[in-house]
Amino acid sequence: AEKLEQSQAQALVDPLTNVLNRAAYNLKVGQLIHEFKRYKEEWALLVLDIDKFKDFNDKYGHQLGDRVLKSVAGTVRDTIRVSDQVFRFGGEEFVVILNRVDQSFATQLAVKICRQVEKDYFVDGDKKLKVTISIGGSIITEDDTESSLFERADKAMYQAKNAGRNQVVMAI
């Protein structure tokens, strides 16, 4: 039984970044939407995307790209609160659930994540390389479904990219 629990837990973790994966996100977001309808505790969804990651990977290789993914995941995990969760959604995209936050606090945390990632650098030979992220966020509303909440945050993330990257846009 213990081995089964272990393998079930491993099935919810991204092996490269060691953060929760998309399957874990799908389980968690459904539960949180249900709880919101019952208890009315606000929470936020952030969608984070590493800016120009494909170009970075093409130029510096997948090994360094993997280091970047691990580092960004770790930075996000270290920046958010213990009650929050980070998930690798796929590729260079991460999703963060911020529990018990309003729009203002969610925005502050998102900006803090953005700035922390911006401070990190990666050594490749004699070069110090940096990456940035764009973040879109949304606060849960009464009418939200799993897809509507994600779509709002994802759209906001693309607005952040289109506005010049390395920034946060919160959906209203």
State what each model feature region is:
Residues V68, V95-R115, E142, S148-L149:
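Short helix/loop segment flanking the catalytic signature motif in cyclic-nucleotide metabolism enzymes
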Residues K54, L69, V76, F87, ...:
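Short beta-strand->loop micro-motif that forms the acidic, two-metal-ion catalytic signature
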Residues Q85-R88, L129:
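A short pre-motif secondary-structure segment
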Residues Q8-A9, R22-E42, A73-R81, N99:
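Short regulatory alpha-helical coupling segments
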Residues L64-Q85, E93, K112, V117:
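Active-site-proximal alpha-helical element of nucleotidyl cyclase-like catalytic domains
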Residues A9-L27, L48-H62, K70:
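Conserved nucleotide-binding and Mg2+-coordinating catalytic segments in signaling enzymes
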Residues V117-I133:
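Catalytic core regions of nucleotide second-messenger enzymes
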Residues T107, G125, I139-I172:
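Catalytic-core segments of nucleotide cyclases and related cyclic-nucleotide turnover enzymes
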